């Protein structure tokens, strides 16, 4: 099937989004995508000078999806759980979004915009949450600091949760954080909510 040149760019992005989760962003190639879409080997280069330019679009789509998931609820704690759920469901995309493979996001305006929008969503939800708790007079820098702390916690807990997923059930950790995480495995949501509340304590 031939794709009309007018929508080839979006088709390439969507195909790359799927390929990212199926086989990892490292294995994406413009040549393979061109073959899958039945276009010439040079066609993708009319829209993306390099593979990294395409991967930046994939990462931007990831931030857009994560932001949308976080915006589905007005509850701040629930939006934090939505972040973790996204990161665990779309692990390859999340690695691309949060890793160093693309370098500075300033090279990719669309990606930078989506990444900033996701953080602003977290920050705004946090501010609304704190106001509901009676903290309506907090300085902006305190709110930003709290938002960054929550973001860092969620990023860290995702890494630990993924490590826990790959741990062998036949050889559970006997000591240390992995043992604790294994013990908490049936109550992740409760643990995450409690931890975020501790971070937000004022």
Positions of PLM-derived features:
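Hydrophobic alpha-helical connector segments
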Residues: 68-93, 140-150
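Append "Primarily bacterial transcriptional regulators
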Residues: 28, 32-35, 44
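An amphipathic alpha-helix adjacent to DNA-recognition modules
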Residues: 9-14, 26, 38, 46-71, ...
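Amphipathic alpha-helical linker/stalk segments
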Residues: 60-79, 98, 116-117, 121-134
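Amphipathic C-terminal alpha-helical segment
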Residues: 148-171, 179, 194-202
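Basic, helix-initiating cap at the start of DNA-binding domains
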Residues: 1-23, 31-32, 53-56
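Amphipathic alpha-helical packing segments from all-alpha helical-bundle domains
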Residues: 107-134, 144-148, 182-201
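Amphipathic alpha-helical segments used for helix-helix packing
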Residues: 89-109, 159-171
């Amino acid at each position: 099937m031939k794709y009309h040149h007018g929508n080839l760019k979006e088709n390439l992005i969507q195909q790359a989004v799927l390929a990212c989760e199926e086989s990892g962003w490292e294995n994406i190639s413009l040549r393979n995508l061109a073959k899958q879409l039945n276009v010439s080997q040079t066609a993708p280069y009319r829209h993306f000078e390099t593979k990294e330019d395409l991967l930046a679009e994939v990462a931007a789509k990831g931030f857009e999806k994560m932001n949308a998931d976080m915006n589905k609820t007005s509850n701040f704690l629930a939006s934090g759980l939505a972040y973790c759920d996204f990161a665990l469901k779309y692990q390859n995309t999340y690695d691309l979004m949060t890793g160093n493979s693309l370098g500075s996001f300033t090279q990719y305006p669309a990606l930078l915009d989506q990444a900033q929008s996701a953080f602003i969503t977290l920050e705004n939800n946090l501010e609304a949450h704190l106001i509901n708790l009676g903290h309506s007079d907090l300085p902006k820098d305190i709110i930003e600091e709290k938002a960054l702390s929550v973001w860092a916690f969620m990023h860290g807990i995702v890494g630990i949760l993924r490590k826990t997923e790959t741990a062998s059930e036949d050889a559970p950790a006997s000591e240390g954080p992995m043992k604790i995480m294994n013990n908490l495995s049936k109550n992740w949501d409760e643990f995450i909510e409690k931890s975020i509340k501790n971070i937000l304590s004022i």
